[in-house]
């Protein structure tokens, strides 16, 4: 649930969205905001254990989001990004994941509540990005026992034709390497069957 397009009124809209969503579905929400005040307001009305999207090593974001999740039972997406930008290699992703996972665990976030997003980058920009992502998923699941992995899948096909076919095939490849969760279009029946 993201209300970031409502600049200046994000908190109000985020609360409204969560209230309305939870009237029709009986599952927790993934709340997406870099604003800790908006997150805290949304969490006050959220029913059940929410997921926060996301924390990263970007200095301002890490410092803002960590107090919201520290010592709680919230699920948290740990985005492999730092103040230096997006990592391109598996090694760079692992370094960031290591700092994020260890920092969260040291602040009493259960390891099973951490969902590392190694960041999918478009293969139309660099054809090695897909391999680097897949290797990162496998390495993260091996190195950090109990941690989950997830991603925003459609980034892989950005700028390319027939995106849905690329997305579906890449999803299967990523799941085979250990990916636990995908941010996808749930109305794509073929994707849901992949």
Please provide the spans of the model-predicted regions.
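Short beta-strand/loop segments at the ligand-binding rim of alpha/beta enzyme cores
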Residues: 24-30, 47-51, 144-158
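Short, acidic/turn-prone active-site loops that include or flank metal/cofactor-
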Residues: 55-58, 81-82
